[in-house]
UniProtKB/Swiss-Prot annotation:
Expressed in heart, skeletal muscle, lung, liver, brain, pancreas, kidney and placenta. Pathway: Steroid biosynthesis; cholesterol biosynthesis. It comes from the Eukaryota. The modification N-acetylalanine is found at residue 2. Disulfide bonds: none annotated. (R)-5-diphosphomevalonate binds at residues 23-26, 78, 156-161, 212. SUPFAM superfamilies: GHMP Kinase, C-terminal domain (SSF55060), Ribosomal protein S5 domain 2-like (SSF54211). InterPro entries: GHMP_kinase_C_sf, Mev_decarb, Mev_diP_decarb, MVD-like_N, Mvd1_C, Ribosomal_Su5_D2-typ_SF, Ribsml_uS5_D2-typ_fold_subgr. Its EC number is 4.1.1.33. It comes from Homo sapiens. The gene is MVD. This is Diphosphomevalonate decarboxylase.
């Protein structure tokens, strides 16, 4: 048990982000520098978030970390990189203050606990939210006020995009030291209030090929990936920023789908090939295109990260009808009451015309559940001490 009160205890939350222009591949593995810029949408923390508590105490003999209740190896290189960067920034800040003595917090060890309210390692960008939350929480506990893009990026590249709400660009940068590889907000969460995001959870299983391993293989073997980074992404970044700025949903939706498709094409172009989509993912893709064809307009878009779960973008006036289409194509088993999570959706009947246009044999249980959410803000500080995941002794609180 700790004999002294902790020097500092901070709890924060951070959001998941979903890239609409994908990041895949590093030009520098140690500094986590991407081969192309990317652009993402920050999801609302009311539905998807990571919560992290960091506690500093003179009584701690080593750094320790718990993820979703299980203690993890604090020596993991990316975790160490985040801790090292934050402590370095804290020292620089202290040294710039007219010779202030080194604060005792910098000579102390830190305990960290983090929980996700969504499946970890299932293609739901858990590492992005996790490392963004870690960087943000450590910065608060150590009194660091500088840009945290580099700290979060060293943990997980896309984590730097979770440091902001709304629509966020991760600029690839050109400098060898990565100082210009930073995240920047393109538009705030209030910019497009009608935009909705539906996550169709196909599988919460851990994927066979992790992102880090997959990226490395693609960079080494895929000529399509090199072509994409150099000749396709720059123009798409500019066009996507325009779509967001002008709230041009049909163009936004089409570009989102095309970029997702090209990302997965680079995975297939990798040798040996990588496949993150499964049969249900492909049925969702067909459902989206048939839904749009029925309406004669692009009403819905899909995107897939490195996993089989679909992320759907649409506007609020289309959500109910699209949910009805998904319900028809992938009727829930016994969990009908828990099929829809998140924002409330008004029930809507599926018209006979749309049902005929979908031309799909139902696949019961293909979609486990749907999370309905919207664009949301960046990381938040929780002021209530009851929110801390660690007790006064620096150990995880017992589950309630």
């Amino acid at each position: 048990m700790a004999s002294e009160k902790p020097l500092a205890a901070v709890t924060c939350t951070a959001p998941v982000n979903i890239a609409v222009i994908k990041y895949w591949g590093k030009r520098d593995e140690e500094l986590v520098l991407p081969i192309n810029s990317s652009l993402s949408v920050t999801l609302h923390q009311d539905q998807l978030k990571t919560t992290t508590t960091a506690v500093i105490s003179k009584d701690f003999t080593e750094d320790r970390i718990w993820l979703n209740g299980r203690e993890e190896d604090v020596g993991q290189p990316r975790l160490q990189a985040c801790l090292r960067e934050i402590r370095c920034l804290a020292r620089k800040r202290r040294n710039s203050r007219d010779g202030d003595p080194l604060p005792s917090s910098l000579s102390c060890k830190v305990h960290v606990a983090s929980v996700n309210n969504f499946p970890t390692a299932a293609g739901l960008a858990s590492s992005a939210a996790g490392y963004a939350c870690l960087a943000y929480t450590l910065a608060r506990v150590y009194g660091v006020e500088s840009d945290l893009s580099e700290v979060a990026r060293r943990g997980s590249g896309s984590a730097c995009r979770s440091l902001y709400g709304g629509f966020v660009e991760w600029q690839m940068g050109e400098q060898a030291d990565g100082k210009d590889s930073i995240a920047r907000q393109v538009a705030p969460e209030s910019h497009w209030p009608e935009l909705r995001v539906l996550i169709l959870v196909v599988s919460a299983e851990k994927k066979l090929t992790g992102s880090t391993v997959g990226m490395r293989a693609s960079v080494e073997t895929s000529p399509l990936l090199r072509f994409r980074a150099e000749s396709v992404v720059p123009a798409r970044m500019a066009e996507m920023a325009r779509c967001i700025r002008e709230r041009d949903f049909p163009s936004f939706a089409q570009l989102t789908m095309k970029d997702s498709n090209q990302f997965h094409a680079t995975c297939l172009d990798t040798f040996p090939p990588i496949s993150y989509l499964n049969a249900i993912s492909w049925r969702i893709i067909h459902l989206v295109h048939r839904f749009n064809a029925h309406h004669g307009d692009t009403k819905v878009a899909y995107t897939f990260d490195a996993g089989p779960n679909a992320v759907i973008f649409t506007l609020d006036d289309t959500v109910a009808e699209f949910v009805a289409a998904v319900w028809h194509g992938f009727p829930p088993g016994s969990n009908g009451d828990t099929f829809l999570k998140g924002l409330q959706v008004r029930p809507a009947p599926l018209s006979a015309e749309l049902q005929a246009a979908l031309a799909m044999e139902p696949t019961p249980g293909g979609v486990k559940y749907i999370i309905v959410t919207q664009v949301g803000p960046g990381p938040q500080i929780l002021d209530d001490p009851c929110a801390h995941l660690l007790g006064p002794d620096g150990l995880p609180k017992p589950a309630a």
